[in-house]
Regions:
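Conserved alpha/beta-domain cores
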Residues: 1-177, 181, 189
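Long, contiguous binding/interaction regions
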Residues: 176, 182-225
Length: 225
C-alpha cells in the first residue's frame, strides 16, 4: 500500500459517518492525485483555476473537483464547465460573476459563502452584517444558475481547541441565520480538518509503516545472502 493510500485510509477511519473528505491536491502533481484515485478517492480540492483545468483534462473524468482558493472573477471561465463546488465565495461581485458564467455554460454552479470568523484580519470572508443585507436583495434572489450549498469559514490558526470551537460555533450561528434565505448546509473548512492529536497519530502510524518496511527490506537482504 502506498504512503498516500495509507494516509487516506487513516483519515477516513477518523471521520464521522456522512462526512465528505476533500483531498487538497493543490501544488501536487497529477501522479500523486492518480495514486489517491487508485486508492479509491474521488474528491479533490485545487486553488489555482488554470492548474485545476489542466488536471481535469489529464485525469479521470469521474473526479469531483472543488475550487478551494480565492477565485478572481476573470478566472471563473476556466473551471465553470466542470467544477463541482466553488468554496470561498466572499463577495457579491464574485457571486454574480459566477451566475453569469454558469448561464453561459448552461449548468448550475454550486457555491459556499465564506464568512470571516477567525481572529486574524488577514483571513478573507463576508462580514456577517453585510452578508445578511445582501441575501435580502434582488440580485441575490435573481441567481437561477447558482445554488448556495452552504457556508464555510477558516478558523483561527492556533492549537487552542477552545478558540477553534468558538470560531465554528460562530459559523454555525451564521448558518442558522441564513437558512431562511436558501442556504442549505453548514460546512466547516480549513486546516483544522485534522486536529493536532489526529495529525500526531497519523505521523506515528506512517513512522510505524516505514519501520516495518525497513525491517522487511533488512530481512530480505539477509535471505539473499
Amino acid at each position: 500500500m502506498s504512503s498516500i493510500a495509507c494516509q487516506l485510509s487513516f483519515v477516513r477511519s477518523t471521520l464521522p459517518e456522512g462526512v465528505k473528505l476533500v483531498a487538497v491536491s493543490k501544488t501536487h502533481p497529477a501522479e500523486a492525485i492518480r495514486a489517491a484515485y487508485d486508492a479509491g478517492h474521488r474528491v479533490f480540492g485545487e486553488s489555482r483555476p488554470q492548474e485545476l483545468r489542466e488536471k481535469h483534462e489529464a485525469l479521470p473524468k469521474d473526479i469531483e473537483w472543488h475550487m478551494i482558493g480565492h477565485l478572481q472573477t476573470n478566472k471563473i471561465k476556466y473551471i465553470a464547465p466542470f467544477v463541482a463546488l466553488i468554496h470561498s465565495v466572499d463577495s457579491a461581485r464574485l457571486a454574480e460573476a459566477i451566475q453569469r458564467e454558469a448561464a453561459k455554460c448552461g449548468r448550475t454552479l454550486e457555491i459556499l459563502l465564506e464568512i470571516h470568523v477567525a481572529e486574524e484580519e488577514t483571513k478573507t470572508g463576508w462580514n456577517m452584517a453585510e452578508l445578511m443585507e445582501y441575501v435580502r436583495t434582488a440580485p441575490f434572489a435573481r441567481m437561477p444558475d447558482v445554488c448556495v450549498r452552504g457556508v464555510m469559514g477558516i478558523a483561527t490558526n492556533t492549537d487552542d481547541g477552545t478558540a477553534i470551537r468558538r470560531d465554528f460555533m460562530e459559523l454555525k450561528r451564521c448558518f442558522e441565520l441564513l437558512q431562511p434565505y436558501g442556504v442549505q448546509q453548514f460546512v466547516r473548512s480549513g486546516t483544522v480538518a485534522i486536529i493536532k492529536s489526529r495529525r500526531e497519530l497519523l505521523n506515528e502510524y506512517l513512522e510505524e509503516i516505514d519501520r516495518l518496511r525497513a525491517e522487511s527490506d533488512e530481512e530480505g537482504s539477509k535471505s539473499e545472502k
